[in-house]
Amino acid sequence: MANTLYDRTIAFAGICQAVALVQQVARDGHCDQDAFETSINAILNTSPANTIGVFGREADLKLGLECLVKGIDSTPSGSEVTRYIISLMALERKLSGRNDAMSQLGDRIQMAQRQTEHFELLDDQMISNLASIYLDVVSPIGPRIQVTGTPSVLQQTSNQHKVRALLLSGIRSAVLWRQVGGKRRHLIFGRKKMVEQAQILLARM
């Protein structure tokens, strides 16, 4: 994996896309299906040729790139996005320090990869299986991510599964961020450069 600004921007957009979709599902009970498929597929895509290969094409990360450019601001929605991103990255840091959990995560994802022989990627059963990986392996590492939204929407089991599967996708992208050399200082001092890179990518779509 190359450690370039481009690679970091792609990985961070992956986190942003998962978070933006969590917001959509938690609020409305549905979300951008193409972006959802990209984010879910990224969980299972563990041997990509390069960073963008995790997601497919740059256009498949449009929602995440848009969120990176204008979704992280001081509005209530932007503050929520920021909270989710910080929480996911903190959780991934704790997870990566636990070899037992990382090994278990790898095993469970391999099992999910085999299940795609029997289920469509976005089948309810498949989403439920991915949600259970998050619940069983990632969530116990703590701290728990508090998802806010419409109570009646979040009470529905299918939406809970989607949210957890998307949080797992966020963790996948946070792992990728670390693999391509992403550091906290890049978020504090280098975010403007990432925004500029994301704008270039969006402009050529």
From Swiss-Prot:
UniProt cross-references to InterPro entries, sorted A to Z: HflD, HflD-like_sf
Localization, UniProt: Cytoplasm; Cell inner membrane
Principal place of residence: cytoplasm
Keywords: Cell inner membrane, Cell membrane, Cytoplasm, Membrane
Membrane association type: Peripheral membrane protein
GO cellular component, one term: cytoplasm
PANTHER family for this protein: HIGH FREQUENCY LYSOGENIZATION PROTEIN HFLD
Assigned protein family: Belongs to the HflD family.
Alphabetized HAMAP family for the sequence: HflD_protein
NCBIfam families to which the protein is assigned, alphabetical: PRK00218.1-2 (NF001246), PRK00218.1-4 (NF001248)
Protein name: High frequency lysogenization protein HflD homolog
Species name: Vibrio campbellii (strain ATCC BAA-1116)
Upper classification of the organism: Bacteria, Pseudomonadati, Pseudomonadota, Gammaproteobacteria, Vibrionales
Gene transcribed to yield this protein: hflD
